[in-house]
Amino acid sequence: MIGRLLAGAAMLGASGALAAPVTIHAGRLMAVPGQAVRGPSTIVVDNGRIVSVTAGYQPASGQLIDLRDKTVLPGLIDAHVHIDSDRAGNEGQLAEFTESVPLRAFEAQWNGMKTLRAGFTTVRNLGDGDSGASLAYRDAIARGWVQGPRIVSAGQSISTTGGHMDGRNGTNDEVDAHSATHHLCDGPADCRRAVRLQVSRGADVIKIATTGGVNSGTGLMTRMEEDEAQALIRTAHSYGKKVAVHSHGRDGTKLALRNGADSIEHGTDMDDETVRLFKQAGACYVPTLSTVNGYLERLAKDPNAYPPAVKKQIDWRIGITGKSLEKAYPAGVKICFGTDAGVSKHGRNADEFEWMVKHGMPAAQAIKAATVNNAELLGLASEIGTIEPGKSADIIAVAGDPLADVRALKTISFVMARGAVVTN
């Protein structure tokens, strides 16, 4: 995975990194989120990489970018997006059956650029439909054909028949006959096959679902047996792939953690035993709280945007959102940052910070989750997540102090990704 991702490290898609050295004068520098913020600093970038970081305003080498009135920090990382879609509910289900694969790839690029301009220079895409759009977009960025954030992609998500990833849920027999089922599995042997298929298609990470989902309308209970989860996770790990697990109910989360999951996505319901298993496994918790914004906004526009069964689950999700984070963070569970963008809006990824702070995380730790912690989760800690010599020049800037008011991260003044200026 890392070799493919680093192949495009010196370029930002079609525009490429700036050829000459670039000097950035930063008024305040959050070089390593979670550590002390530095005062006036100078960052030198060359060939897409950070060459040096020094105190004070040093003479410019090549082009000068003046950010002396800004807070400068590493490019943000969203560990849970669906880059090829910006719809959900009835509209999203219709799109699955009416939009072509090439159109979904164009949509991925459209959403990717909104995400990049919002300061998120890396994303982890946790599930396409059957389009493979995120894989194609990832590779096009790496080849320099188009612009976009660095993408770590799961390809298609895996679940059991009738589980969260079964697109046939609620459809008639004629639709069922033409629906993809190769990402569904039943029994350990079949689940090993499903992982191997996604790896063969180029997945960087494996995403599985141990419970139903809010949008799938089949309930939020556990939808996978112990031997199936074990087969999925062990097979993925044998290929060197981390495993992200969609789970809402506590039993599905415990099932995943017992079997070595690397991250839990959503984790909406959590008890003390769940927290203990998180810490024992060393897994990262990705709360995706800002999905609530997406649900509320769609329902405000159309009260019938979701089928009744889904609407019931949305009401439950809204009522309990943030409770697990309030339990997990003080207990020492490692928190990572993800939005589930596609359910919520691409380009508004920073809304998640406000939710995290609302539910008990200091702004500094929420920012660390979206940089240092996520870089570790993605296996890219040597490349991204901090502003240090040798790393990819993924750098953003905001007016004001995001430690005092994390909402400052909703308005990005400057974006550099892999040494190329996207927004200034």
Q: Could you describe each region identified by the protein language model?
A:
Residues 1-18:
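Gram-negative bacterial Sec-dependent N-terminal signal peptides
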Residues 83-104, 161-180, 215-225, 282-318:
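Active-site gating loops and adjacent loop-to-helix segments of metal-dependent hydrolytic enzymes
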Residues 136, 190-285, 301, 316-334:
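Histidine/acidic residue-rich metal-binding segments in metalloenzymes
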Residues 87-90, 134, 163-164, 217, ...:
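Histidine/acidic-residue-rich catalytic or RNA/ligand-binding cores of hydrolases
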Residues 96, 238-242, 306-309, 315-402:
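His/Asp/Glu-enriched, well-ordered alpha-helical/loop segment
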Residues 29, 33-73, 95:
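Histidine-rich, glycine-flanked metal-binding segment
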Residues 71-139, 143-145, 161-164, 227, ...:
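Metal-associated gating/positioning segment near the N- to mid-region
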